[in-house]
Structures are given as C-alpha cells and as structure tokens.
A protein has these predicted regions:
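Non-catalytic, solvent-exposed segments at the cell envelope interface
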Residues: 2-13, 18-239
C-alpha cells in the first residue's frame, strides 16, 4: 500500500473514534453495552488491498456506561490468531491484517479473537470502516475550516501541513509542522467536529454515512442499529 493510503488509514481510524461516540449510543437500549465498562473494536480497512481488505489499523474504544472513556491503538503487525491458519492460501498462522479474507462477518469475529489473545482486551462490539467510506464522508463537507481558515486541502495535506513526522521512508526534508502525527491528525478531527455543528453539513455527513453503510463501506456487529442511529442523532456527539 502506498504512503498516501497509509496516511488515509491513520486519518480514518482517529476520526472513527469520534464516530464511535455516536455509534455506541445506539447500543444503550441493549443489555450488553448498557452498564459498566464495555469495549468496541474499531477496524480501519483498505478495501482493495486484498480479498476482504487489508486491516491496517485498529483501536479499542473503551466505554464507561455508554460514554467513551479511553481508546487504545492496536497495531496489527505481528498479531496472530491462537488456533486458526492463514486464509487464501497464505502460509502460517492467521494474521490480524489478513483476518477479513473470507468477508466481514467472519472476519470481525476473528479480529476479536486475535486482539483478545494478543492484548487481553475483550471486544463487546466491532465496527469496520473501509477507506472508501470515510473518504466519502470527509469529501461530502468540503471545504473545511481548519483553525478558523477555510481550506480546500485534502485530508492528507492538512496533516502534512502540521506534522513533523520524518520517520516514514521516502519522506522529503521539507518538514514544516511542529506537531506529532497524532496531534496533526487531531487538527483534522477538530475541523470535522466543528463542521458537524453546521446543521446542513451534519445532515450531509449523516446522509453520506447512511449511504456508505448501505454500500457496505461501514459494517457493524452487532448489526441493525446504524441506520436508525444516524437517522435520529447523526454526528452530534462529534461536536
């Protein structure tokens, strides 16, 4: 996967932490996530990388009585399933990166098992967002106002303006930002959050999210609550 797509995956997963704040509320009427500490495993997937998509980044989002309390990055590199062999003719144990080979439903279960085996963190629900899905949501509310200034820059370029990340192979020496990659991404997240306060943009984001869910670019387990949630609450908890 090329550098641009890897940055997109980083953007996807951090923004999805905010979207999960909305999604999580949809489970509050069910007994499994209503009370106590619960976890949602959020998977960022490059849909066209391989069969089923390549899982490039994940976060475990921790809920405290339905409110996001924390999130923990889960880096797929080196994480394997305790008992399953690799799918698709690959050799060795099943890797977290490749667990979606046979499709999202089975893949989400494999992802839960792999993450729990390797980290001890149990997931009560799983959300997949493919890069196509979040790209569409981001693009639907351009131009963004970043730090009070309207910009038509791409999400990747917004991050590049602010970060000082020099560790990626091939990165040129023209580093102009003074932030960590995480903080630079949060600049974009804040911009999207502010955009969602505009009722028209919020409605647009909600509509696109529902469309992307219908296209299969956002997948949830347990399923069935996303459309109802987005139709009623939209992206309010991002604000």
């Amino acid at each position: 996967m090329n550098r641009r797509n890897k940055i997109i995956i980083i953007l996807v997963i951090v923004i999805i932490v905010g979207i999960v704040a909305v999604i999580a509320n949809s489970f509050l009427s069910t007994p499994t996530l209503t009370l106590g500490d619960k976890n949602i495993l959020v998977l960022a997937v490059d849909k066209n990388e391989q069969s089923g998509g390549g899982l490039d980044m994940a976060f475990m989002v921790e809920l405290d009585n339905g409110t996001i309390a924390n999130y923990t990055p889960v880096y797929p590199g080196g994480m394997t399933h305790p008992t399953k062999h690799a799918l698709g003719g690959l050799s060795g144990p099943m890797m977290l990166h490749d667990c979606l080979w046979d499709g999202p439903e089975q893949g989400m279960e494999y992802a839960k098992e792999i993450v729990e085996y390797n980290t001890g963190m149990h997931a009560d629900a799983v959300v997949i967002i493919y890069d196509d899905g979040l790209d569409a949501i981001i693009d639907s509310i351009r131009p963004l106002k970043v730090d009070g200034v309207v910009t038509n820059l791409s999400s990747v370029d917004i991050v590049r303006q602010n970060d000082n990340y020099a560790g990626y192979a091939g990165r040129d020496s023209g580093i102009t930002g003074n932030m960590s990659r995480g903080d630079a991404v949060l600049v974009l997240v804040k911009a999207l959050s502010e955009a969602s306060k505009d009722p028209i943009k919020k409605d647009t984001m909600t509509k696109v999210a529902i469309e992307e869910y219908s296209k299969g670019n956002i997948v949830m387990s347990p399923s069935g609550s996303f459309i109802k949630l987005m139709a009623t609450k939209g992206f309010e908890s991002l604000s």
